[in-house]
Structure formats: C-alpha cells, structure tokens
Amino acid sequence: MESKESQSLHVEYYGEGEKTIVFIPGLGGTTRYWSHGIGPLAERHRVVLVDLLGFGASPKPWTRYSVERHVAELDAALASLGAITLVGHSLGALLAIAYAARHRNQVENLVLIGMPYFGSEEAAYRYLRSGKVKWGFLYTNVLLVMIACILTRRVFGWLLPYVRRDIPREVAEDLVKHTWRSSTSSLWEVVYRYDAANELRRLSEQTQILMIHGQDDDIAPFAAIKQLADEQPGSTLIELDGLDHHPFLRTPHTCLTHIDSLVSGDRP
C-alpha cells in the first residue's frame, strides 16, 4: 500500500498578489521551464510553480501515473491556495483540464500552451508514425521509450544541454529528472488515453479558457487545437505564426501579456 501522507510535490512560490497563477510543466519539464520568465507576472500576482509527481524534485514512486493519480497529488498541493488560474504546457495542459474538471469551484481560468490532442490512442500512433515528427515512431513503443529514458538519464544526460540548443540550458538539464516509469506511464495514461475534449465540456461556463499554440507545432498539431477551440464556448485561441511546441520559451513576453490580461480581466 502506498503511503499518500509521505508524498509531497515540489512547489515554489513567487510574488504576493491577490490573484494566484499555478504553472504546470509538460513531460520532462520542471519548475525551471517557467522560472526564467515569470518575473514580470510575479510583480502583480502570486505565482506558483509545481513539479508533477515523478518529475523534477517531486517524489518518483513506482506507481501507475494515471490522470487520477496526478490530479490527486496536485489537489494535495493546491487545495489550500483558493481560487486559481491554471497554466499548463503540453502534458501539463491536459492535466490542467483534468484538474479543472474536478475542481470547478477553484479554477477560474485555464491557459493551455502547446497542448497535444489526438482524440484517441490509435490516432496518436498514426500521427506519430506518419513521419511528421522526427523519431515520432519511437514514442509509440513503450520498450523503446523506456530504453531511451534509461540511456538518457544514466549515460547521455550530460550531453543534453549541448544537443538541445533550442531550449535554455537549465530546461535541457532537467529533462533527465524523471524515471522511465514516470515518463512512459504519464505519456500513455495522459497524452494517449485521456479524453481532454470530453473533460472540457464538463467545465463551468464561467471558466475562461485561453489556448496559446504555435502554428508550426509538429508535436501537438495545430489543426486539432483549432477544432477544439471552435467547439468550446468561452475559449480563445492565440495563434502564434512560425512558433513550435514551446511558445513560452520562444516568446515569454507574449505569453505573459495574454495570461496577465486574462487574470486581470482585461481581455476584450
């Protein structure tokens, strides 16, 4: 039996504003994915950064990293914060939806950045095996993903800052802060098998939804997000021309401006 009492997600707090904004990173991400860019936001609001279970400085138990388990751990960390705006990137965006659907009275706003949505596990496999994503087929084989995780963490991890020059050094360094179990289980349970569209429909009409997505995102296809946004009442889609899967890393000022406007009630 797992001791839930022994689990405690790593959480960082910045600023002391009236509004609280919680940032959830994607697969392999940590608080350092956000920390370089949230300074201006923390001058006006209380900003909370969290490492998901199995990643970063949070515990990494041998468990099934299901949507329900992730949400339960987030609830233990966030329940005392009162009303919040949830900002999630990639897998973190999917978990933000899941959390909001189960805590509709707490989550006032949702910001979904680079969120992957395929509709089903089979559709995800078809897309990743289509050749549109470099080495995409690898992410559809749990054994290959497991081997890649082990080799990266134990052998080649020190090379990541030199290989992944498209992202900040600290973000690349933290890509090894997980286990093969937390990585593979989260990928399959959350990205491939979770029905985000159905959960979006469960949200309160008062929940404001902001989607920020790069039009050149090959990991999370833009067309699927465009369709979701069109079907979801009260949602706004910010289309970023020429950007990939990491809008917050490429243009943090743009992302922060939209987030601040949403939280402050300044959206047109």
Where is each model-derived feature located?
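Conserved HGGG/HGGXW glycine-rich cap/lid loop of the alpha/beta-hydrolase fold
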Residues: 7-59
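Conserved alpha/beta-hydrolase catalytic His-Asp/Glu region
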Residues: 122-123, 144-202
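Active-site loop/oxyanion-hole signature of alpha/beta-hydrolase fold enzymes
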Residues: 49-87
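Conserved alpha/beta-hydrolase "acid-adjacent" motif
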Residues: 218-224
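Gly/Ala-rich beta-loop-alpha elbow adjacent to hydrolase catalytic centers
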Residues: 88-92, 96
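Short beta-strand/loop motif that positions the catalytic acidic residue
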Residues: 203, 211-213, 217
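Flexible "cap/lid" loop of the alpha/beta hydrolase fold
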Residues: 101, 109-142
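Catalytic histidine-centered segment of alpha/beta-hydrolase-like enzymes
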Residues: 243-256
